[in-house]
Curated annotation (Swiss-Prot):
Keywords: Oxidoreductase. GO terms for biological process: glycine decarboxylation via glycine cleavage system; nucleoside metabolic process. GO terms for molecular function: glycine dehydrogenase (decarboxylating) activity. The gene is gcvPA. HAMAP family: GcvPA. It catalyses: N(6)-[(R)-lipoyl]-L-lysyl-[glycine-cleavage complex H protein] + glycine + H(+) = N(6)-[(R)-S(8)-aminomethyldihydrolipoyl]-L-lysyl-[glycine-cleavage complex H protein] + CO2. This is Probable glycine dehydrogenase (decarboxylating) subunit 1. Coiled coil: none annotated. Signal peptide: none annotated. InterPro entries: GcvPA, GDC-P_N, GDC_P, PyrdxlP-dep_Trfase, PyrdxlP-dep_Trfase_major, PyrdxlP-dep_Trfase_small. It comes from Chlorobium limicola (strain DSM 245 / NBRC 103803 / 6330). The keyword Oxidoreductase applies. Its EC number is 1.4.4.2. Belongs to the GcvP family. N-terminal subunit subfamily.
């Protein structure tokens, strides 16, 4: 629909209706010396076709996984997303919905969120899940703040190798809150040292945090880490990859008090870094301390099932100064995508995705380490990604592979380390894996 400007008569009628004689009356309070007295220096008007051509030209400078074979990981993964996911979430009643404060007119949205919460509880083996957080990093940061509130303590121990980006967000949250100190456990073979962790524990530790699998893709000794936390009265927080839970033990099964995760692999595209989905689950005793929105199921006066936002006194729109967090509009659409994705795959489907990731990652690691100069940096078990020691700097390899249409991985020098972090999802075919190996061999 074209934009039709107001006529002089339209403007006169509007001014007259508010008691003004001219537009200058509306800006009389702005000192003349700071007013712009010339026309704005804007681009000349373009047609729709010209705008599309301009934007396509600008976007062509980007390289995306849509046109490359991607082995990039480190927190965002190139998984296959069934076309039905987009078809369902694009329905207008989902796509344009806002926060469902009025339950009587939002039953569809509320039920969808309730189903998402139920799926997260089953996947993570926890009692309660909220409606979502902004992303996995903010979910973990909120979990740490929650642990400090519950325990009254101020220290947090990072038991293993946490994503440096998540760690940066956590540091920002703690600095903004005015309290909290982070202690990093020492690493051995790319995972946290259990003995080192025990040496860091004391009665001031509010929470022990572990990422499973960790940033290197390696599997941490989560049961021993959880036991060390419980022995000292600290809460045990696990940031678990949701896809890995298709084959790995769920956080609830080994005693997590709070389990969070990055939900991007569940039906959400990489989206150049966002929007993403923060998964947040807790045990029942902590339900009134959980941040974010909660959808509950109830009965109406006629005995029919209904869905509502429950325990709202925790939230900032009720009692801002006493809210458990100030998250407002959450990632409900991303959460819906995760719920639709899991519904389409089912229990067996998510298990198959996890198995394919593991098998293909181990196949690729085996093939690459047959090449001269390439070796695994760590020998700990891994799930979907692994760190390579390479004969050439990782940046050189990544640049060379780009010319062959391959994202070779993540250069760990970006976080002050050495090595190439390579991720493999179920999307990668045997031919793509072998082609990557051949391309590396040709360097």
């Amino acid at each position: 629909m074209p934009f039709i400007v107001n006529t002089d008569q339209d403007r006169e009628e509007m001014l007259r209706s508010i008691g003004a004689s001219s537009f200058d009356d509306l800006i009389a309070d702005i000192p003349p010396e700071i007013r712009l007295d010339r026309a704005l220096e804007l681009f000349p008007a373009l047609s729709e076709q010209e705008v599309m051509t301009l934007l396509e030209g600008l976007s062509s400078a980007n390289s995306s996984s849509a046109g490359f074979v991607s082995f990039l990981g480190g927190g965002a993964y190139d998984h296959f997303i069934p076309s039905a996911v987009k078809s369902i979430v694009s329905r207008s009643e989902f796509y344009t919905a806002y926060t469902p404060y009025q339950a009587e007119v939002s039953q569809g949205t509320l039920q969808a969120i309730y189903e998402y919460q139920s799926m997260m509880c089953r996947l993570y083996d926890m009692d309660v899940a909220n409606a979502s957080m902004y992303d996995g990093a903010t979910a973990l940061a909120e979990a740490v703040l929650m642990a400090m509130t519950i325990t009254g303590r101020e220290l947090v121990v990072l038991a293993g190798k946490l994503s440096p980006y998540t760690g940066s967000v956590l540091k920002t949250y703690l600095e903004a809150s005015g309290h909290g100190v982070i202690h990093q456990n020492r690493l051995e073979n790319g995972i946290g040292s259990v003995d080192g962790l025990k040496g860091l524990m004391n009665d001031r530790v509010a929470a022990v945090v572990v990422q499973q699998p960790n940033f290197y893709g390696s599997l941490e000794e989560v049961e021993a880490i959880g036991a060390a936390a419980r022995e000292n009265g600290a809460l045990f927080i696990v940031s678990a990859d949701p896809v890995s839970l298709g084959i790995l033990a769920a956080p609830g099964s080994y005693g997590a008090d709070i389990a969070v995760g990055e939900g991007q692999p569940l039906g959400n595209h990489q989206n150049f870094g966002g929007p993403y989905l923060g998964i947040f689950t807790v045990r029942q005793p902590y339900v009134r301390k959980i941040p974010g929105r909660l959808v509950g199921m109830t009965k109406d006066r006629e005995g029919n099932d209904g869905f509502i936002l429950t325990l709202q006194t925790r939230e900032q729109h009720i009692r801002r100064e006493k809210a458990t967090s100030n998250i407002c509009t959450n990632q409900a659409l991303c959460a819906l995508q995760a719920a639709v994705y899991l519904s389409l795959l089912g229990k067996q489907g998510i298990r198959e995705v996890a198995e394919q990731c593991t098998l293909k990652a181990h196949y690729l690691a085996g093939r690459i380490t047959e090449l001269p100069g390439y070796s695994l940096k760590y020998s700990a078990p891994f799930f979907r990604e692994f760190v390579l020691e390479t004969p050439l700097p990782a940046a050189v390899i990544i640049s060379a592979m780009l010319e062959k249409g391959i994202f070779a991985g993540y250069d760990l020098s970006a976080s002050g380390e050495n090595g190439l972090l390579v991720a493999v999802t179920e999307k990668r075919t045997r031919a793509e894996l072998d082609s990557f190996v051949q391309a590396l061999a040709a360097l």
